[in-house]
Amino acid sequence: MIIINKRNLFFLISVWLLSTLLSAQNVTISTPHTQLLLSVPNGGTPEQLYYGSRTSDADIRSICETARRRNAYPVYGMGYPCETALSVRHADGNLTLQMAVIGVKETRLTKENATLTVIELKDKVYPFFVNICYKAWQDADVIETWTEIRHEEKKPVQLQQFASAYLPVRRGNVWLSHLSGAWANEGQLCQEALQPGMKVIKNTDGVRNSQSAHAEVMFSLDGKPQENTGRVIGAALCYSGNYKLRIDTQEDDWHHFLAGINEENSWYNLKKEEVFRTPALALTYSDEGMSGCSRKFHQWARLHKLANGNTPRKILLNSWEGVYFDINEQGMDQMMGDIAAMGGELFVMDDGWFGDKYPRKNDSYALGDWTVDKTKLPGGLQSLLDNARKHGIRFGIWLEPEMANTKSELYEKHPEWIIKAPEREVVCARGGTQVVLDLSNPQVQDFIVQTVDELMNSYPDIDYIKWDANMSIITQGSQYLTKDNQSHLNIEYHRGFENVCRRIRASYPQLTIQACASGGGRVNYGVLPYFDEFWTSDNTDALQRIYIQWGTSYFFPAIGMGAHISASPNHQTSRSVPLKFRIDVAMSGRLGMEIQPKNMTEEEKALCRNAIAEYKTIRPVVQFGDIYRLLSPYDKQGAASLMYVSPEKDKAVFYWWKTEHFCNRHLPRVKMAGLAPDKYYKVHELNRIDTEPLKFEGKSFSGAYLNDNGLEIPSTHRVEPSKQNEYASRVLYLEEVTPSFSDNRIEQRPPLRVLCLGNSITRHEYKADIEWFSEWGMAASKEENDYCHQLEKMLSQNRPGTVVTPLNIAYWERNLNCSIDSLIGAHTTDKDVIVIRLGENVQDKEAFKSDILRLVEYCKRKANKVVITGCFWKDDEKERAIINAAHMYGLTYIPIDWIDRLYDSRPKVGDTLYDIHGKPYTVTKDFIIAHPDDKGMKKIAEAIYRVL
């Protein structure tokens, strides 16, 4: 029995009250590996205490007691000595703010796998309110923060400065890394030690915002930036319009970082009860250098900030540098046939295909008139789509929907739709006639959406749109906005643009859309939720692309980075670069081609055909792997190198390019990174042109050795004298193996006992009423062709005796929360591997989110290795639940919904299958044709095999 006297009772109550007070005054915002700590006293000022790696509860308590505090969102006018985040002019003319905490709310965003924390502030005198919002992702180490501003004053309040966020960075030897550039020279890396004074990075283009500078930065906290060591804070403003990043360094101990919309000439008149939401600033932190910071941005992008971020991107040919405006039906058909013959998967017809009254013969005509030029394409788009289908590839098309020419039917009909200053003449740009449509006008927004709707409704087989934007807002004024709100144009344009994008993406979620804006003018996280990829630069010169793509990779993943093989001499730089080098550079992003194939030799086509086949092998690693930058071209050491490593660390792709050409130049040996030290990797060179293989071809090395030493890369190619030149490049594919230490050859491995948990795709019993007369994976023509049997055959090549057992547990999908042990327990005995391939039959998606975790946890206890695939039928909500389960339990996640989009992988009514007795029968039921055919089954098996 515990006896509590009055003194003890007083002490316990005091401790409880103090604990409650501390809890009420402090807010912890966490991702899996990072943490932001705030002090939010009721009636007081919100303050930042800590941002960095995730720490313990004990440390949090100590931080709260000892940390130096900085205002979490500094406002103007009441004594704050540095740059402020928010300044306003109240309805009565007062310029000051004094914000105090009035509440804190936390909400679990289950569908997004995130937590939203809102700190509510109110001015101490005026009915003026600010919400500071923090969205912490639970499957990625990113915290997004923004503000929501409103008031209840009688008249509008003018917002004069309205940053999204403020972050104090402790002074020391802090370096800033950011990107600058120009057309055809985007993404140039700039690094500098922060000095006293004001550093400003801003954009005023109005339409594009990532050509001359970028709205993303990194702060290296331990001195000169290192790629794979050191503490780094990354920040990315998720906005498509004009922005301003400020770093104010005064006499105190902090660099004051503020980011948000560029307020210059964009002051905003906020009406009563209107909510002004600033764009989000995404923050991440890594103690593994700049590459570590990049890996966190890339993972977050693929999961949440890039449309269809888990879907492999197709290999395409774009017509632009091949024919420019000289488009015709026969030429397009020939280009489609050529790329199909080389193994490509998509053809994109670029500018020049449209215009009736004003044919698009150059860039002076027809923007806005999105009708086919029948003189160029007498069969219309349908003929091109039919030809693409004939060649076995998909078809895409170019649009510039935000623009018009004064020589267009659209302009003649709606001159009031363009951006034009009141009482001023029209100002044109590109081609002498190009103008920008005013997207603040809802009618213009409707027109753009209708343009895409008409195109997609008429031609639903269109697979890809290249969305271009080749002009700035060079005349400040709107014919739609009122005279009092002319300063809203730059903000309202991008609100309108986002509204257009949101509507289009909602209607066509699977349509691939590329963000192009005179090249890399729209590489930002404001637009990428609506776009699948971006055109990195109009400059396709391979040597310069190394620098452009290197810089871009700091914030954006390879899956979104359009990288094309183009002609030599290059059309932008006139530089002659050998095809091997051009291929090796393009293969480090989303591979494509921008060339006229009929001008290529048969030898060149064969080299490209081989490269495309090689890229299909490494595509999962490049597009979904973790980046490690190894040797920077900006360090001027004569070479550049980076690599991608699969999340499971069982595969990697290593790139090396010689960037400078001097006689007797000694190039550094490059250490690799990211490989598992205890694993062994077999080395295979891709795109080889040398007459002899590399000395390490086919050899295996430990990850520890490669991380510590790398390999000696020859700086020249052994080729015929007539083919020798100053360029050299290598692409190495590394696969995990079990080595024989005696002769460096791969031993045969012991057999595996694999259990595949699935549904009808895994195995379906004989069922006459649906005309399924077999007992294997549904829609496979024969037992040996379903994915389980194909997987067993693949594994048995170097693991003789392997047995793959299929188990249909569709019952679990339809009856979540049932007993897992009674359902599968007896089948899990002595299993080495369990493959979870489920989800298509799930109806209760909310229950699925928790029960898939339960299933994974059970399987982890039963087998040495567990892998999990996504769904064959695409469902983003289910896919997120599966990805979350994989991340939480450290499983290998295998996406497979791309199979049906990249390949014609379902049977058709009329196809022949075989029953359990080997007799043929004809498919008649829609239920069966929803399942993968033999080809689809093989792709599923291959995807799992690559992991196992």
Which residue stretches match the model-derived regions?
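Active-site neighborhood of glycoside hydrolase catalytic domains
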Residues: 373-380, 412-414, 418-580, 588-604
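C-terminal beta-sandwich/jelly-roll accessory domains of carbohydrate-active enzymes
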Residues: 660-741
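Conserved SGNH/GDSL esterase-like catalytic core that processes O-acyl groups on lipids
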Residues: 747-755, 762-849
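Carbohydrate-binding surface patches
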Residues: 33, 217-219, 227, 633-677
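Polysaccharide-binding surfaces and accessory modules of carbohydrate-active proteins
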Residues: 25-38, 44-248, 264, 680-696
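Short Pro-Gly-centered flexible turn/kink motifs
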Residues: 33, 95-101, 268-287, 727-735
